[in-house]
Curated annotation (Swiss-Prot):
Organism: Arabidopsis thaliana (Mouse-ear cress)
The family this protein is said to belong to: Belongs to the methyltransferase superfamily.
Name listed for the protein in its UniProt record: Probable methyltransferase PMT18
GO terms under cellular component: endoplasmic reticulum membrane; nucleus
Protein location: Endoplasmic reticulum membrane
Enzyme Commission number(s) from the entry: 2.1.1.-
Organism classification: Eukaryota, Viridiplantae, Streptophyta, Embryophyta, Tracheophyta
Gene3D superfamilies, per the entry: Vaccinia Virus protein VP39
GO-annotated biological processes: methylation
Keyword annotations from UniProtKB, A to Z: Endoplasmic reticulum, Glycoprotein, Membrane, Methyltransferase, Signal-anchor, Transferase, Transmembrane, Transmembrane helix
Topology with respect to the bilayer: Single-pass type II membrane protein
Amino acid sequence: MAKENSSHSLAEAKRKRLTWILCVSGLCILSYVLGSWQTNTVPTSSSEAYSRMGCDETSTTTRAQTTQTQTNPSSDDTSSSLSSSEPVELDFESHHKLELKITNQTVKYFEPCDMSLSEYTPCEDRERGRRFDRNMMKYRERHCPSKDELLYCLIPPPPNYKIPFKWPQSRDYAWYDNIPHKELSIEKAIQNWIQVEGERFRFPGGGTMFPRGADAYIDDIARLIPLTDGAIRTAIDTGCGVASFGAYLLKRDIVAMSFAPRDTHEAQVQFALERGVPAIIGIMGSRRLPYPARAFDLAHCSRCLIPWFQNDGLYLTEVDRVLRPGGYWILSGPPINWKKYWKGWERSQEDLKQEQDSIEDAARSLCWKKVTEKGDLSIWQKPINHVECNKLKRVHKTPPLCSKSDLPDFAWYKDLESCVTPLPEANSSDEFAGGALEDWPNRAFAVPPRIIGGTIPDINAEKFREDNEVWKERISYYKQIMPELSRGRFRNIMDMNAYLGGFAAAMMKYPSWVMNVVPVDAEKQTLGVIFERGFIGTYQDWCEGFSTYPRTYDLIHAGGLFSIYENRCDVTLILLEMDRILRPEGTVVFRDTVEMLTKIQSITNGMRWKSRILDHERGPFNPEKILLAVKSYWTGPSS
């Protein structure tokens, strides 16, 4: 009897459990059907959709129209950069109906500076320079503004400013309205530096010491030393004038860093950059030049007015530091060939002879060998190593070899020293100190000796090659987002954080040159590597102004730069400096995190720039994004 009761209870329990499962399943199915029915009621208009989401249709439409306007400016080149036909613009703004009163996100619009500042160079200001000692030209060196002298305004282009001629036409012509100075054409009329032809300047290629033109002058040099076999790639032209020497070296695949001081009215470096020729404001003064040791294959001075014989040959010692083993120094002008020119130079024969003797002595003290003196040219060559020089310095100790603790590549606000920078150790007299370089153009992609020697921490041959591949991919992507890149729109280009120079290497096939800047605050100091690849560049602290005139670059690349400086100085000041050196309708490519790029964009919106944020070239899942910005065309008022 007990067994029958137990079986009955078990059957009853199973029946209740099954009933419960069926009820729950039924409720689930009913909920699914109801949910599906409600979801399928799609809104038939955008107004209905905005109403359901609680959004304001008017504000959303306005935002969309504004975005479309920003990405399609009137200029043809500008519209190519910011058109949305290729990569999709990313929008990181919130789109909620609730308006948040956040005052620090309000766009601050920057007003134009006074027209008297149209050619302002912040760290080479003439008025500020007068406060400093004239000894060793200190008053013409870099002296940047103090905190209360900083400008928070936009440097205005001159009235009627025109987009410069494209290369190679720009080598020979520039618009008068862009650099309205006729003084140089009058002062140097006999020397054929520059001529005024209507509304244009013309550069015939003449110079003080090359009356037949820079091309013929370079041909004269090529008869004395090899210029066309790729062994000489990088040059430095001290006291460059309008850089005709550098302009005509380019056709021989030699790139020159031309420099001259800020002029009172002649604007020589400004003319050089307007021509599309590499140049920078600089002077041989009391400090090292802002380049690493062993940077240049050739150094040149054509009546550059540098007192090479003074201060025990201190300036020649600096040339020796930046000259590569086996590099050449070329001197023309006083005192070379003084027997022919002494009357025209209005100096006595004795004075000129003494100056040349002093230069010869200084060159010998550096262990240089005189290659030749022919006509107006004199050429010396630096030894390929210091095997013999070390023996000589045991006897002739002036100037001495610099201390091993001295950092030969360090050159930012570093005072000159009267000592010879020692070359890396060599095992034999025929070995190139620091490693031999490939001839150009193989040099651009060969692993640089500094990397082979392990002098750059955590950088090896494999990482170097990987970086080159990365930049090939990036330039391919840039061609999509900046179609004008393939059309030769950009001549003067700056890479504000150049690293290994991969950007410049990937740009070799375009009619452009790149100023490779290595920030002094960068984790790895790689400027020496860049020069070993056959490119040029300089050191720079981006909390300060760059040594160039306004409106001198067509394209600026800033990859990861602001993450370096965001805690060091005001990001706004760096962006205003970029605006100063960027030409109207010039383009900037930023690479950084979304947070940094949105911060940058909020500032540039008040600088008359138009911009959009794009995905990384490898897709949306990479945290690094790209901000592509174009400076609008505008000019200052006519006086």
